[in-house]
């Protein structure tokens, strides 16, 4: 792991777990390190519950931070995955009688870097998702304009870009990409709500803000901007993700791996790329509430309150069915 990555992770750890003025933590959370996080949660016909030392059993929730001594149990066919800090992998707890007590985090040393990496990537989302799920109040409409979903007002990695908006796969749209000097690409009669940047189009310049415009019929044009980062920054992000993968090891499930990758990307401001990771995770694990919760969190950050509400509703449904 590079020195730059180690410094970044330590700083993130301090910001997230010492100075972040986000959702208030329980009393025992304020005086103890995070030793694990719930990254997968499927109640099925049973229940997944957690109990802090000296506390009562309570329903578990996605991305719940756990401390040493906390207990997790699963009944009937319920199951959950708990990611341990310090590069210690995951524990799977399954019903009907699965019980697990969270062990203490590893001592400082070689494990310290892994602990900072895991807690930085997950802790950022874990601290805000609870606020988001309670704060979203959206008015859903049967007829939606082609609101741009992604990328939406943020930085993106210089990979093949695909733009998405709210719409029908049978409808036709006008898609226009505008740069500082004027239109870069103008396409009419684009079918469906997804458009990939053409390989033969002019290359996008790093550090330049572009605006995507999508028009459906006589409705007003919908706009969102994005900025492609330069090659050096992209290499740094790729190195961070590779370091994350190395610390997780092969035993961590694809779903938990997606949660960690999305958390790290979102913490660095790459919400478009974080969303791609979550959407890919959902394609393989559609019934995982944690992924829907993360997707709702990303939509909240980008101002898409209707989509956030739908994602949070789906997470709640999967936890209660």
Regions inferred by a protein language model and the residue ranges of each:
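Flexible, surface-exposed loop/linker segments and immediately adjacent secondary-structure boundaries
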Residues: 29-166, 224, 236-241, 260, ...
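Long, contiguous interaction/recruitment modules in multidomain scaffold/adaptor proteins
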Residues: 102, 131-251
């Amino acid at each position: 792991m590079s020195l730059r990555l180690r410094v970044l992770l330590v700083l993130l750890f301090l910001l997230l777990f010492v100075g972040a003025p986000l959702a208030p933590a329980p009393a025992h959370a304020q005086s103890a390190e995070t030793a694990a996080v719930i990254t997968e949660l499927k109640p099925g016909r049973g229940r997944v519950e957690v109990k802090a030392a000296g506390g009562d059993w309570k329903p578990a929730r996605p991305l719940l931070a756990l401390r040493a001594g906390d207990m997790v149990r699963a009944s009937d066919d319920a199951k959950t995955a708990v990611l341990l800090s310090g590069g210690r992998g995951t524990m799977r707890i399954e019903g009907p009688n699965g019980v697990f007590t969270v062990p203490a985090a590893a001592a400082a040393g070689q494990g310290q870097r892994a602990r900072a990496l895991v807690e930085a990537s997950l802790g950022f989302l874990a601290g805000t998702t609870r606020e988001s799920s309670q704060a979203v109040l959206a008015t859903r409409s049967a007829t939606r304009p082609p609101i741009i979903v992604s990328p939406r007002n943020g930085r993106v990695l210089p990979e093949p870009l695909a733009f998405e908006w709210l719409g029908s796969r049978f409808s036709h749209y006008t898609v226009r990409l505008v740069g500082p000097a004027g239109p870069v690409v103008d396409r009419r009669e684009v079918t469906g709500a997804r458009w990939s940047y053409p390989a033969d189009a002019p290359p996008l310049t790093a550090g330049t803000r572009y605006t995507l415009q999508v028009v459906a019929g006589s409705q007003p044009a919908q706009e969102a901007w994005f900025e492609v980062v330069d090659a050096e920054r992209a290499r740094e992000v790729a190195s961070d993700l590779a370091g994350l993968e190395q610390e997780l090891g092969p035993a961590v499930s694809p779903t938990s791996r997606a949660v960690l990758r999305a958390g790290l990307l979102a913490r660095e401001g790459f919400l478009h790329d974080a969303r791609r990771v979550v959407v890919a995770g959902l394609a393989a694990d559609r019934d995982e509430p944690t992924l829907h919760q993360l997707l709702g969190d990303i939509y909240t950050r980008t101002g898409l309150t209707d989509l956030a509400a739908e994602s949070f509703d789906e997470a709640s449904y999967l936890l209660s069915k």
